Curated annotation (Swiss-Prot):
This is Flagellar hook-basal body complex protein FliE. It is found in: Bacterial flagellum basal body. It holds the Pfam family FliE. GO terms for biological process: bacterial-type flagellum-dependent cell motility. InterPro entries: FliE. Keywords: Bacterial flagellum. Its main location: other. Belongs to the FliE family. It comes from Nocardioides sp. (strain ATCC BAA-499 / JS614).
């Protein structure tokens, strides 16, 4: 019997871009656009992970899936990604509410 190493599942976690501390501060419109792009990219990644999990679930239910662990990994990845997205959303709402409570001048 041959023993092989564990194959990667093809997941590459999102890594935030590195900032150069010597760069001047950009205007708020540029920073807002970059933040918006990051949010949209994160939601697109979440949707892709959930779609993969759903596709593998259908294959598992119909008997077309050869390795059930592929579905288990995809379902867990989708669950963790969803939990992370909800946590980020909650923190963003907390920050927004805190800013709204700040007194003006």
């Amino acid at each position: 019997m041959s023993v092989n190493g564990i194959e990667g599942i093809g997941f590459t976690p999102y890594v935030a871009p590195q900032l150069n501390p010597t760069d001047p501060v950009r205007g708020s419109s540029q920073a807002g656009a970059a933040f918006g792009d990051m949010v949209i990219d994160g939601l697109d990644r979440l949707e892709a992970v959930q779609d993969k999990s759903d596709r593998l679930a259908v294959q598992a239910a119909t008997g077309d899936l050869n390795d059930i662990h592929d579905y288990t990994i995809a379902a867990t990845e989708a669950s963790v990604t969803t939990q992370l997205t909800v946590a980020v959303r909650n923190r963003a709402l907390e920050a927004f509410n805190e800013i709204m409570r700040m007194p003006i001048g």
